Amino acid sequence: RQRQMCIRDSNVKGRISYITSHARQENLYATYRTADSTFWSNLARESQQEFQRSGTEGKCIEARELIIALPEIYTQYEPQQVLTDFTEEFRRRYGVECVSALHHNKRKTNYHIHLIFSERRLLPEPDVKVASRSVFFDETGKRVRTKKEITGEDGQIRKGCTVIKKGEVYESHLFTTKDTRFKGCLLYTSDA
């Protein structure tokens, strides 16, 4: 049995902190990470930038979280080993970075893993776009062709519009696009 949650609103780092904090989780037995906090900070920032650029309605999904119930027999095994093995298998199978935590609920009736994972992979080299000529963006962040399109009646660039001068970086990506396998579906990992 498992549930899937989307981590939204610049909260992947907050959610990681919450599930891995002994101060906030009284029945926390083990935690495990395949990527450091810099990875998750960069992922959150780039996801938010992509979301704003897309102009999509709703909320930005920075990462996904699975909550996987384990049979109580797993309480007999060493918690760190259970969590490490499970997380590394998920990482190997899907090729994604993860943070995980092994918990019991307050009544100790539900032994479970929280597994947060990235839908994007780190690129081998950052993809940096440098303006070969001046680039103009309107108030919504949409690229326009000419300076005239973002200039007000007073001859000044309108508030909220942006000009990127020739030779400046106007876009950079550290991550791939989202893996579509994870969109709107549950992942069943019990067939291992």
Regions found by a protein language model. Give the residues of each.
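N-terminal nicking endonuclease/strand-transfer module with a His-rich metal-binding environment
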Residues: 1-4, 8-191
